[in-house]
Amino acid sequence: NDFAQATSLLYNAPIYMDDSSGISMPEIKAKIRTINQDPKKEKIGLVIIDYLQLMTTGQRSENRVQEISSITRNLKIMAKEMNVPIIALSQLSRAVEKQGNNSSHRPQLSDLRDSGSIEQDADCVLFLYRDSYYASQNPDGAEVDADTAECIVAKNRHGETSTVPLGWDGAHTRFMDVDFKR
């Protein structure tokens, strides 16, 4: 059966997850080094941090903006030192919710939460956006396509910025190529 095959494939895949709360940069580095030094395991090829703002510096700090700046700077250094790409997910500020006056809630770099250093240190910044999410706030009452989304390439240090149209499958919480047939 397909489910059993997929489960087996994922179980045996070289994917390492750590759901430690409040993990610090030194802890992440140590865990990556431990895995990379184990001859029985594949080296880490990608690090994904789900929610940058849950990380800590490992030191006491009363200024969250400075702490996030330190984290993003150290993530950049770690990516170069360990030769591994890092994807860090971040929350947007509430300002994007209040942008109804200009009839567009499309996120901008200035909407990244807690620090301008996220924008500064990142090589690439992507935003996912769906018009249908804000349809009830649409002042002109225009219909929006619930099956479409956008990937906004807001920053690209090594290439162009643009907006890429995507398909949206809300029933499965899945973004896909617009030409993908369900």
Question: At which residue positions do the language-model features occur?
Answer:
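Cytosolic-facing regulatory segments adjacent to core modules
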Residues: 1-43, 57, 163-165
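Phosphate-binding/switch region of NTP-binding enzymes
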Residues: 67-182
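Conserved Walker B
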Residues: 52
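Flexible beta-alpha connector loops of hexameric P-loop NTPases
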Residues: 1, 15-22, 56-69, 96-110
